[in-house]
Amino acid sequence: MGVVRVQHETKMENQSWLKKLARRLGPGHVVNLCFIVVLLFSTLLTWREVVVLEDAYISSQRNHLENVANALDKHLQYNVDKLIFLRNGMREALVAPLDFTSLRNAVTEFEQHRDEHAWQIELNRRRTLPVNGVSDALVSEGNFLSRENESLDNEITAALEVGYLLRLAHNSSSMVEQAMYVSRAGFYVSTQPTLFTRNVPTRYYGYVTQPWFIGHSQRENRHRAVRWFTSQPEHASNTEPQVTVSVPVDSNNYWYGVLGMSIPVRTMQQFLRNAIDKNLDGEYQLYDSKLRFLTSSNPDHPTGNIFDPRELALLAQAMEHDTRGGIRMDSRYVSWERLDHFDGVLARVHTLSEGVRGDFGSISIALTLLWALFTTMLLLSWYVIRRMVSNMYVLQSSLQWQAWHDTLTRLYNRGALFEKARPLAKLCQTHQHPFSVIQVDLDHFKAINDRFGHQAGDRVLSHAAGLISSSLRAQDVAGRVGGEEFCVILPGANLTQAAEVAERIRLKLNEKEMLIAKSTTIRISASLGVSSSEETGDYDFEQLQSLADRRLYLAKQAGRNRVFASDNA
């Protein structure tokens, strides 16, 4: 039933195991043995401190990494949020376009130029971005391209509207170098202007052949989520590596196009350098989802800590099971964390030499010296320390027992009983088990004290406590709560069962005479009150004790030496 078993009698050992061992082996052997044990435990403690220090070092590495990762994530999240905002605006514009004359004129202009090899529609260069497009013939040649869409006019006006938002969202302080909307219907809007109309087809097909566009087909991106892509420079090209975050634009289960933002790797490198604490060692490295190196916080040695294939395999294996962690690689410790708003990993590489020069290296050296000093002092002063510890242990055990028990009856005292009762009542309430309380008060105890003296009264209390303890179940708890008053806690017992236990206590107390003086015996009795949580559903121990106490006094008024389990009988 999950009820804690409580022992009602506590044995006091006369001698500790150290004294028994000393009697058998002699003080010298005991001292030597204790010295070995303490030395062993001091070594284990030092080892434990080393483990804690290592954990603190790992936590420090992770905290430094987390601070930089959070700062980078914050900026990336800002750009992702802008992208989602632009997509929502695009969807609204597709469903309910603005009824402006300039937008209607733009649709008319599109119909006039849609057959041209390249065309451009511009409303106001100072307020919005132009829409650049290619001919119907060129669109028909693309696998993913199509103008067979009833909402094509709405998409044209929506592109002009989102061009206004793109112009507002793009600024020089942003990490984003270019923001664009690329449509499957053969046109695009970009914050990077197309100076010559003849360059529109080349630029458009450069967009629609990129992975960040193709990867948003309904087959490749079924969840229509934000995705990140990395472009690496080719040997014959001066194109700077960059990452692109993009999201598909859909409406009524139709894929219109892709909204994207391109971030140069050099911008992310500059941000890493600004985000890290200049007083801290270690190098930060950014990798994409395929663990391809993107950039490092160390511009002087950009390839100094790049991992070999075996180390990359170890990292990939560790990243399969968690979003953050750390791993030791030879003399380096690598902590890593997946970014929330970028499909990649930020790693921090800390070498052994950097660790030794740091605070944790100094602490490790100091800890070793302290262990050596402690061992030397232990060798000189062990005998005195052993005696102090032994005496303090005996004193502590004695004080603890006295704090929880009544020394006369060897039962729990009032404070300890209340401490035991509350968790037992809560446990019974949790499992919907009954919880009962018995209050016991010895009859005419004051008369025994007055007639035979307090020494006889103490014998009566000790005798009664022993009989009460022997009448209880294993899980019951008994304590002395007053002069001649006892309380019994019965977890799991209903009112009927508690009344049976109370009757058993009453009979045991009353059926045996006890010798209190030479040729003088007396028979004692007690009045008992019983209460249970099943009566009112109340598991409050103090309330149940008060109810049992009231019934105890009803038993007193009814003639004593009886059990009252209700207010009527």
From Swiss-Prot:
Pathway: Glycan metabolism; bacterial cellulose biosynthesis; Purine metabolism; 3',5'-cyclic di-GMP biosynthesis. Binds 1 Mg(2+) ion per monomer. GO terms for cellular component: plasma membrane. It is found in: Cell inner membrane. GO terms for biological process: cell adhesion involved in single-species biofilm formation; cellulose biosynthetic process; negative regulation of bacterial-type flagellum-dependent cell motility. Its main location: membrane. Its cofactor is Mg(2+). Residues 433-568 form the GGDEF domain. It is a multi-pass membrane protein. Keywords: Cell inner membrane, Cell membrane, Cellulose biosynthesis, GTP-binding, Magnesium, Membrane, Metal-binding, Nucleotide-binding, Transferase, Transmembrane, Transmembrane helix. Mg(2+) binds at D441, E484. Substrate binds at N449, H454, D458. It catalyses: 2 GTP = 3',3'-c-di-GMP + 2 diphosphate. The active site is at E484 (proton acceptor). GO terms for molecular function: diguanylate cyclase activity; GTP binding; metal ion binding. The record marks K446 as: Transition state stabilizer. Its EC number is 2.7.7.65. The chain crosses the membrane at residues 25-45, 365-385. Catalyzes the synthesis of cyclic-di-GMP (c-di-GMP) via the condensation of 2 GTP molecules. Cyclic-di-GMP is a second messenger which controls cell surface-associated traits in bacteria. Involved in the regulation of cellulose production. Homodimer. This is Putative diguanylate cyclase DgcQ. It comes from Shigella flexneri.
